[in-house]
Structure formats: structure tokens, C-alpha cells
């Protein structure tokens, strides 16, 4: 139900573009234009036909809004504001606006092209912007994972990642740039449409010229909106997509080597704001250092740009950024605090308006020492010593964390890694353990299945003699995770892509303490 509009959006584009082309080409071929120029005006005739097509489009949109809602309710999944808003946005973008684009495409072809040429242009546009376009666009670059992302962003109007397992935490992307795509193409087709009307209209030519200018403006605004940087979860074959960005980066940038720090971070105070990407103010309380120099080396994923580093007195400290390493200089070995301001995103583990998935092992906050984050795939890294965390998250959607939620909405507690989830996510308590899960996953996260599999794991845990603290199980999205990422054991909680596989992964050797 969640992905129905997105899987069919290419069909809506095909249907309305061909229907529009037939309607308007017949109008042009019947020579009706010459008859109406001297009477009601050519614009009113085309406007009337367009209104009929738009009315049909509205009806289709309403149906494909109500049907997924009804299906979701009948399936027993929780009906939340996030789910209703998502289905509404999906219907607007992938049904209505795709239908409008189809009408515009057909009108453009009817006004400017001959019969067969028009069909050819429509066919090529649909081919490039539909699901097959992802493979076609990669051919000139010698294969997948090499084409520039802007090319995919320009042409791939269909949802990306339909051939991959759905991310039930997130859904398919409905970020602002997806609407900017439609705006660009509506403007691109609207410009020649209104220029043509200005040529053939008997009157109101200035109105059509103004509409042409507005279309050009829409095209420019759409282009600007498309290229704005930020966190985008894109399971596509583009060079910088969620699938390929890290592999391409580390092909030309050596991953950091493992080198233990001569200090520890005693506590973190993280103030995070999530909009188009992650914006962070991190206050770190450091232990004494045994080093002779005044430098501290941290690991912070290279996708985050450090704006400033200051000490406890507010003095700016010099720092150097090289790949995943951050080297801070200018202070002695005494205990002190550092305040770092940085912003950015991880290409696969997203932080945007639609959702958050920030595992505690990807160094989205500074970790002490030099750590290797990539070795043929993402390598989970955790500090040797747990720290005290206080985490505040300003996000459009509710955020879930394994740390205890405080009255002011922050999270706090001692851990060796903080994981944050947001989106189509909920939590429940089973067997004394909090389970954070994607409620749209009707396979493993139906209430009865979730309870059964969690209790099975807890029994296996007791049988294995695992006495380590366990307060939370966090079910993570499956987004091309490496084997090491699929189940991660922290000091006080577990994250994994499936509860049913936790016992086999953690206790395969028959030992509980590992």
C-alpha cells in the first residue's frame, strides 16, 4: 500500500501523456484553431480540454489516495499522522503531478511535433524517466555506479530503489527535491507551450508571453531545488547514491588505520538538529592525555564538515580534517572540554525530514583515536570505554533511542554507542525489554509475530548464559548492510535487521559472553 503510487507513477505518466497527445493533436489536425481565433480565442478551447483532463486526473488521485489508506487500515497497521501524511504526499507527487506532467508532455508534442515524431519523443521521455532509465543512463558511463548523480536526479522521475527491499522505516523518498524534479519539467514543457500559444493566438499574446516567463522561472527554481545538497536516501546506481558513494570515495581516499587514542571521552552532550541534513553541536569532556604534544585525534565520518572547534573557555582551536580523521591542536594535557560544530550526512544512513537512521557505530559524532570505518564495506566501530551521553534531537518526526527519555525530551544514559531512529517507527515492551521497530513491516513486526520472536530470542539468550545488560532491541532497516552491520552488540542494547536471526548470530559458538 505504501509504495503503490510510486510503483505506478510511470503508468500515470504514460496514460495522461498519450491521452493528452491524442486530444490536442486531433484539435490541431481538425483545423479548429483557425475557426476559434476570430471567436472565443484559441486559449479557451485548449483550456477547456485541459480542464477535462485535469478533472480526470483529480479523480484518479483521489482513488489512489483512499485505496492505500483503506488497505493500511484493513491490514491492522497503526494509523499514524506520519503514515497519512506520507500517503497524501505520495498521491500528490506520484499521481496528480505525474498526471499533470503527462498532460503537459502531450500538449507540447501536439503543438510542436508531427504525428510520429511526437510519439517518439513521448516514448523516449517515458523510457528515460521510468524504471528502465536507471540502467539506460548508466550505459554511456561503462556500467552502474559511475554515472553522475545529477543525471539521475534530472531524469529519474519514478521512485528509485523499487528493485530493492523496501525500507519500512523510511518508505520511498518524498523529499522536496522530488517535487523540484516535477517543477523543472513542467516549466521546461510549459515554456514552449505558451510561446506557441503566443504565436497562434489572435489576442492575449502578452498573457501567454507572461506565462512563458513564469514557466522559465519554474524551470530555474526546480533546477535549484534539485541540486541543493543534503541527506538523500537513494538506492540507485548513481555514483554518489546510497549504494555507491562510500565505495567510490574510499577507492580514491584511503580509509584511516586503527590507532588507539591516548585519551578517552568521558561524556558527550549532543545537540542535534535534523532538516535537510544533520546539524550538530557536540560538547566532549575529555580525560587526561599521556601524549607529549597538544594534539587530539578523533574519527568523524568524512561526510560531516566541521565548522569550528573551541575549548572550555570558548577559545577557537586549530584543527585539521583529512578523510575520516579530525586532528585538534592547541591545548595541553589537562582535563578539558571541546565544543565542535559540524554539519553533513552519511549517504546510506540518512538524517532528513523524512526519517533518521543513525547507528551508533558510524561515527556521526567524534570517536577518540583513529578508526577504520570502511574495509570493503562499512565497518562498525565502537569505543573501548562507554561514556555518559546527553542527546537532544530537534526533528520533524518523533525520535526513538535506547537511552532513557527525560522529561525535557532529551535522552541520557551511559553507553558505548548512541543509535537514533525516526520515521515509521514505534516501540513496545516485551519480556522486560524495549523493542523499537518499523510498524509497517507486516512480516516480522505484526504484534503477535514481534512478541513471539522476541520471546524466542530472550529464551535463547538465557540458554546461552548471556548475562550482559540488555534494555533495548532496535530493529534496523535493511539497506545493503554488510554482514558485520546486520547484528551489532552494544554494551546495553542490540541492533539488528531481524529479531529472528539475533540468536543464531550472537550465540553461534554457544557462548553468551563474547
Range-by-range predicted roles:
Residues 342-418:
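Extended, low-hydrophobicity, Ser/Thr/Pro/Gly-biased non-transmembrane segments
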Residues 19-59:
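Helix-loop-helix units of permease transmembrane domains in multi-pass membrane transporters
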Residues 117-130, 207-218:
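Central hydrophobic cores of alpha-helical transmembrane segments
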Residues 2-11, 15, 21-22, 50-118:
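Secretory targeting signals
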Residues 391, 427-514:
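Juxtacatalytic substrate-recognition/specificity segment
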Residues 81-82, 138-184, 204-276:
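N-terminal, polar/Ser/Thr-rich
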Residues 293-295, 303-357, 457:
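A surface-exposed beta-strand-loop module
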Residues 1-27, 197-209, 219, 434-449, ...:
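Hydrophobic alpha-helical transmembrane segments
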